[in-house]
Amino acid sequence: MIEGGEDLTFIARRLIISASEDIGNANPTAFIMANNCFQAVGVIGNPESRIILSQCVTYLATSVKSNSSYKAINEAQMMVNKTGNLPVPLHLRNAPTKLMKDLQYGKGYKYAHDHQNNFVDQEFLPEEISGNKFFDSIKET
């Protein structure tokens, strides 16, 4: 791509996308590496940017991979496109006023930090689509 005359910042931008889409949370440092590569390419320019790009490419190529975040956002967006705007469940709504409290906003909300391992079994989706799962951390890698 470099020898073909492709813009170096375009190459670096594609590396950021690859780090997020193809590697994701299997190695979150890959995203940082790719973003730093993009910034360095913008500062350094030719001809030395080829070395920076090479370092980033080899790091990304040898990293563990996971596309679960990419798949999760696709599934979530497909659900929204299918169902349209659905109301936020009442227990997730903020209740800064007496009226909102009287309307049951926030009632029954479980604050994860008050529970073991900062995890709570709680439905976060609207009733019409409750039970759907877009991401499974067990299958992350």
Protein language model features and the residues they cover:
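Terminal-proximal interaction/regulatory segments of ATP-powered molecular machines
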Residues: 1-119, 125-141
